[in-house]
Regions:
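N-terminal type II signal-anchor transmembrane helix
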Residues: 1-31
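Amphipathic hydrophobic-ligand
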Residues: 30-33, 59-72, 144-163, 189-199, ...
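Hydrophobic residues on conserved beta-strands that form the core of alpha/beta folds
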Residues: 37, 50, 66, 84, ...
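Transmembrane beta-strand segments that form the barrel wall of outer-membrane beta-barrel proteins
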Residues: 179-183, 207-214, 286-293, 372-380, ...
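Tryptophan-anchored aromatic micro-motifs
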Residues: 127-137, 414, 455-456, 554-558
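Secondary-structure transition motifs
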Residues: 31-33, 52-173, 191, 219-231, ...
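Residues on the solvent-exposed faces and adjacent turns
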Residues: 39, 52, 73-75, 91, ...
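Short extracytoplasmic
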Residues: 29-52
Length: 584
């Protein structure tokens, strides 16, 4: 009878709780801390539930508290294999920290670690189902200051942790699981993971995933595989420098702000983009292949890229190739850059570039370093025309500007096709141009570019309702909106040699000498009558934006004017001009 009573008593929660408290008290004395379990329920030795589990550290601060732990065991197999049906953890918190090079949980690790196990021997745990809900996790390394931005792996505060996993296998350092759901809120950075599903492996060597889906507040990411390789868990403390990526991403929506939380050097970025591609290597040297990116309303690019180390931009190698580009200026203005590249995070676009409205192109390459690189492109199209840069343009960084130099190919640096130059520079007298150029110059930014050397051929140049052809430019420059050059024109209706400059600041100031050997004025749309021709030597110093708005002086020598087979000759002439739409 006593035996039956004892067996029955053991099956009651009160007795089970009492026996568990004896064990808890023993461990409390052994560990010099407090371990407490408020209630225990055991059914048939294969199901057990613990309520109110409390573990304090050796300074009597709460290390862990769990409301309820439910465990259902299938069987215990010899050779250290535990086969568990289900573990359910409901509510609780873990408060871990490191101070003065000591972790507050180190005493538990020391106590339960086995010093007499053979090398390689361990306990394998097989778990069919794992459910965790309403859990909180804190970790602080008080020996290390907090980072001001992003996820700091030495200072974490996860709330609302929810985990649902199947086929969990734990063996020493290697952990495997099929994660059906994982969600949490990292309070310090603000990052919220709404759901993550995948087949995963976790170990000191990193995280390997298959069939990965990540849903956050701003991102939806789908990847057939995505791996983060490390030499130890400590590498996550230096995520950008030590964690190696290897993954493939199907078309996904990604928040660049959320990316910057994991790579703080990208702080300032805050755009939603659509992308797909393959990624390899570390964040600070990330290689992206077969990449497609869609941004804003109408912009996208396709190509292969090697992202630089933004902390060491001066020494980072650039190897970027855009196979296809379609970019609108309105979308470009919405891009927010890292603060390391722009103090206010914005791209400053010059008004002259805004007039292009869009840029389409293919086979665009950038190769080199921040201090010296080459840009080339098969063709770039815009609303106002197109250019070709097949031979590449060399840029060299100086103290506060970039020096760009003409190529040594002997052909051209830029070929211009049907460019509406007048619309681009907002001059109604000028129309479309076609030609090819070689040049060198200085670029301080997109709003401040000067061409110190310029040479080329203009096949077509539309000016004042006439399309001039065969224009050869040499010894040219465009500095501070002043165009200086020597020009030889061999048009069917105009033949001249020009030497001078045009100042496009405040009303177009022209200072030049011209040796005019032929000008069929009526064909050039500047003659008063038909069959009018002019030849002369000119010196001009005039200001004006067109023929109806000219002021200045013209000096002529050896002038010959022919009209209807009648000639008029004038050895010398000085003309003072003051003309407007209302008066001559």
């Amino acid at each position: 009878i006593l035996i039956l009573i004892s067996l029955f008593s053991i099956r009651t929660s009160t007795v089970q709780t009492y026996l568990t408290q004896i064990v808890a008290n023993f461990l409390s004395e052994e560990l010099n801390t407090k371990i407490e379990v408020k209630r225990v329920s055991i059914v048939n030795l294969d199901e057990i539930a613990f309520d109110g589990v409390l573990v304090k550290d050796q300074k009597q601060d709460t290390l862990a508290y769990i409301n309820t732990i439910y465990i259902s065991i299938n069987k215990i197999i010899p050779k250290n294999i535990y086969d568990i049906n289900k573990i359910n953890i409901q509510g609780g918190a873990f408060h871990l920290f490191k101070k003065n090079e000591q972790h507050n949980f180190q005493f538990l690790k020391n106590y339960f670690s086995s010093n007499n196990k053979k090398k390689g021997e361990g306990i394998e745990t097989i778990l069919d189902e794992l459910e965790v809900s309403d859990l909180e996790f804190k970790y602080h390394d008080y020996d290390t200051p907090k980072t001001p931005f992003g996820i700091d792996y030495k200072h974490l505060h996860l709330k609302n942790i929810y985990i649902e996993a199947n086929r969990v296998n734990l063996l020493g350092d290697m952990n495997k699981a099929f994660i059906k759901k994982l969600s949490f809120h990292e309070v310090l950075s603000g990052f919220k993971l709404k759901n993550l599903t995948c087949q995963a492996k976790f170990s000191q060597k990193g995280i390997n995933t298959r069939r990965l889906t990540i849903l956050t507040e701003k991102s939806k990411i789908y990847a057939p595989y995505f791996n983060l390789s490390t030499s130890s868990f400590k590498d996550f403390n230096h995520f950008s420098e030590k964690v190696i990526f290897n993954g493939k991403i199907f078309e996904s929506k990604v928040s660049t702000h959320e990316v910057s939380l994991f790579a703080p050097t990208l702080e300032g970025m805050d755009n939603d983009i659509m992308l797909k591609g393959e990624v390899n290597d570390k964040v600070n040297n990330l290689k992206i292949d077969n990449f497609t990116l869609k941004l804003g309303v109408n912009s996208q690019l396709q190509g292969d890229f090697l992202l630089p180390n933004f902390k060491k931009l001066n020494s980072s190698y650039l190897n970027e190739r855009i196979d296809y580009l379609s970019l609108t200026i309105s979308d470009l203005e919405q891009i927010k850059l890292p603060f390391t590249l722009s103090k206010n995070g914005k791209i400053k676009i010059a008004p002259i570039l805004k007039r292009l409205e869009y840029i389409n192109g293919n086979n665009i390459k950038l190769n080199g370093f921040d201090k010296q690189f080459v840009i080339s492109a098969n063709k770039l199209n815009s609303k106002l025309g197109s250019i070709e840069m097949k031979n590449g343009l060399l840029f060299t960084k100086k103290e506060n500007y970039y020096l760009f130099e003409k190529s040594t190919s002997g052909e051209y640096d830029i070929k211009i096709n049907d460019l509406e130059l007048g619309q681009l520079i907002q001059n109604k007298s000028i129309g479309k141009i076609n030609g090819s150029f070689q040049f060198s110059g200085i670029a301080k930014d997109l709003n401040d570019i000067n061409f110190t050397q310029l040479a080329g051929n203009l096949n077509e140049f539309y000016f004042e309702k006439y399309n001039y052809k065969n224009i050869f430019i040499k010894e040219g420059s465009i500095v501070d909106k002043v165009f200086t050059s020597k020009i030889d024109i061999k048009d069917d209706n105009l033949s001249l040699v020009y030497d001078g400059y045009i100042d496009f600041n405040k009303g177009n100031h022209l200072v030049m000498s011209i040796d005019l050997s032929k000008a069929i004025l009526d064909n050039l749309n500047i003659g008063l009558k038909k069959e009018s021709n002019l030849s002369s030597n000119f010196k001009l110093d005039i200001t004006g934006t067109g023929y109806n708005s000219i002021n200045g002086k013209i000096q002529l020598a050896g002038l010959v004017y022919t009209e209807n087979n009648k000639s008029f000759k004038l050895p010398e002439l000085t003309i003072d001009i003051s003309r407007s739409e209302k008066r001559d």
